[in-house]
């Protein structure tokens, strides 16, 4: 392109809302390229959207279509958090399952810098909550985590935004625990 472009990558998670939520803001310089390595999982009726302020953008998307499993399935959640200074458990592992989270990203859409955000994990069996990270996120900025979090039944990942709205996206594998024989 002959000019810089401002772009948003968004996910519409139809199990939660019919509105698309930005999960990444990107500026691409004139004539430049960008590559996003974001593991996005779309479930039935979900949509991936790209918004740009410059026409005639070329986008390449690589994907894999997975069958829905009986005992395990890949899931994704995209949610808008609209209450500042209040913890939101955006993923809670259901009873009889284990969840392996491989990616979490928070996108600040508040219009200003959110300076005191907190990302935590709650271990329900120990009744304890531990801080994973805390700090500031600029407007249209992101805080992303490409690391594994394992949640057992009742455990949760939580985010407390300093400003609102914040969009959260997470991809994970949900494994249904098999019944134990002989009990």
Predicted regions and their residues:
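Beta-strand-rich interaction surfaces with strong enrichment in secreted/lumenal proteins
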Residues: 22-26, 37-39, 79, 132-135, ...
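Coil residues (strongly favoring Ser/Thr
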Residues: 5, 86-89, 124, 156
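Short, surface-exposed beta-strand/strand-loop-strand elements in extracellular ectodomains
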Residues: 3-25, 111-133
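C-terminal interaction-tip segments
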Residues: 43-44, 52-99, 103, 107-109, ...
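Beta-sandwich interaction modules
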Residues: 29-45, 139-154
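Tandem-repeat/low-complexity and Cys-motif detector
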Residues: 1, 27-28, 51-52, 94
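A short, sequence-level motif marking secondary-structure junctions
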Residues: 27-30, 64-67, 135-139, 174-176
